[in-house]
């Protein structure tokens, strides 16, 4: 299935649904140079856990995931 990932740019990925969020972060890192540790992947505004698969998160074909930079604060 196709999945859209919006980080600094919009990317189209071909996935099976068995990939983990951590694998998507690694792919975004290779495309845009953003460290996976500095990424937050969002589905409809909710952050996704690294260990979860796309299928477990409810990601369907043609879904757009947002990738935001982690905010540092104290």
Swiss-Prot record:
Coiled coil: none annotated. It comes from the Eukaryota. Belongs to the ubiquitin family. Confers arsenite resistance. This protein is synthesized with ribosomal S30 as its C-terminal extension. CDD domains: Ubl_FUBI. It holds the Pfam family ubiquitin. This is Ubiquitin-like protein FUBI. Gene3D superfamilies: Phosphatidylinositol 3-kinase Catalytic Subunit, Chain A, domain 1.
